[in-house]
Amino acid sequence: MQVLVRDNNVDQALRALKKKMQREGIFREMKMRDFYEKPSQKRAREKAEAVRRVRKLARKRAQREGIVAR
């Protein structure tokens, strides 16, 4: 990953790098790799994440269509 440093402005470059890393999901991956995750736990987590994603999409679609379901 590469970030340009303009006018020796290191703070701005660090902010840009952090934003890029956040977008790429590097921080989340580092947190996940901190400890070993058993394959069965990984499958369960991924399945739960998929369910969460589907529900979130359905909520957004319903809200867009004017149907508010809670």
From Swiss-Prot:
Gene Ontology CC annotations of this record: ribonucleoprotein complex; ribosome
Listed InterPro entries: Ribosomal_bS21 (IPR001911), Ribosomal_bS21_CS (IPR018278), Ribosomal_bS21_sf (IPR038380)
Domain of life: Bacteria
Keywords of this entry: Ribonucleoprotein, Ribosomal protein
GO biological process terms, semicolon-separated: translation
GO molecular function: structural constituent of ribosome
Coiled coil: none
PANTHER family: MITOCHONDRIAL 28S RIBOSOMAL PROTEIN S21 (PTHR21109), SMALL RIBOSOMAL SUBUNIT PROTEIN BS21M (PTHR21109:SF0)
Family to which the UniProt record says this protein belongs: Belongs to the bacterial ribosomal protein bS21 family.
NCBIfam families: S21p
Protein name: Small ribosomal subunit protein bS21B
Organism whose genome encodes this protein: Rhizobium meliloti (strain 1021)
